[in-house]
Amino acid sequence: MSLNTKQSDPINSILVKISIILFLLFSGWLLYDHFINRPLDVRYYLTANNAFKDKRYDISLDNYLKAYSYNPTDAYIIEGIARSYMELDDFENSLKYFNLAINTDQEFAPAYANLGVLYDKNKDYLNAIKFYEIALQIDQDLSVGMHWIDRLLYDVRTKPPTIMDRLFYLKDQMLLPEDKRILSIDEIDNEQINYEK
């Protein structure tokens, strides 16, 4: 049997055409479902996440609030609002939304971790320790910190301190006499990241 016979086989030609048509239909459906048929709260949430990662916190806050208007029971959306307020230095609103996220899902460890970061930024170290411990009790994976792939994608050249690192440091400092404590070092504190899941 020669190659020319295979190419002129009508069944082979029909099967190839059917395969191409099915591939195009399936790809079209996937694109439609992914981009067009996506619920509005998910669209706003993803836009907010991208803006947050690009450090455009006012845009992220606006989109998280839009997502929240469609889905007020999603802990991820609520916690995103709180993180945006935290980065915009609005302590009271950030605290309000972190507490709302925790009340919505009491097992959502990033809300506790980021609430600890909020207290840490505001120099309330005892509450920071408390919420870091709660976050680590719920999810030990938070002690690992930023994954190397994320560091590569977001061009983070040095490994930022984790909440476990910060927790140990704060606890060690609390053991010292008050006049010997160094609880805040701006260069290190500024490297501390927000936690996502």
Residue ranges and their predicted role:
Residues 46, 80, 114, 148-149, ...:
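Canonical tetratricopeptide repeat
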Residues 2-15, 144-197:
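Terminal, low-structured helical/coil segments at or just beyond the last alpha-helical repeat
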Residues 36-73, 80:
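Alpha-helical segment of the N-proximal tetratricopeptide repeat
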Residues 53-54, 87, 121, 155, ...:
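Register position in tetratricopeptide repeats
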